[in-house]
Amino acid sequence: MGMIPGRAGAARLVIVGAHYDHVGVRNGQLYPGADDNASGVAAMLAVAGALTGQVTEASILFVAFDAEEQGLRGARHFVNHPPVDLRSVTAMVNLDMVGRGDANTLVVAGTSYTPSLRAVVADAARGRELAIAFGYDRPSAAGERGGDWTHSSDHGPFHDAGVPFLYFGVENHGDYHKPTDTADKIPAGFYTEVTQVVLDTVRRLAGGERSGGRDSAP
């Protein structure tokens, strides 16, 4: 975990998370997990680096979760034994598989529960060369394409605890949970655009001002 303190201190927090575990090795075969979820961890670190030194109202807590692939155990432990007051968390931003999207599309779930967050993401994505697909967070959508992703990753336990969330991700692809999920298949252009949208979203959520730090993610 790492914290960028804001003017409000612990009274107002934004959590940015990504799980760092993957399948590992099965039958002697390495599963690299480039998209799931090295892409999310690297994007989180880029956002943290870009925001370091900038002035924000809310404090920003960055968390790398373990054991997501074993039932969201890391996130559940965090929520069950929170090191911060969850009532002060205005949003949990979860990055899970953000490296490669069909038709240049980034999925953003969570806005059905907290509609005000949709405008925050839309503003952050304006002018970017990617499409934003909102939704994927309604129980009634279970039979639809994409379905309901409310509990599909580390944001789930936070949602159950009453914390608003934004889940940035992509549809499953043919290399999901396979040894072929390698870094060479992540398009640099798409990944850069996604990371910039996440950065601008977090900056808006935290009430950030563009001063003192880098203006974009490396």
What do the predicted segments below correspond to?
Residues N27-N37, A50, A64-F65, A103-T111, ...:
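Second-shell loop/turn segments in exported
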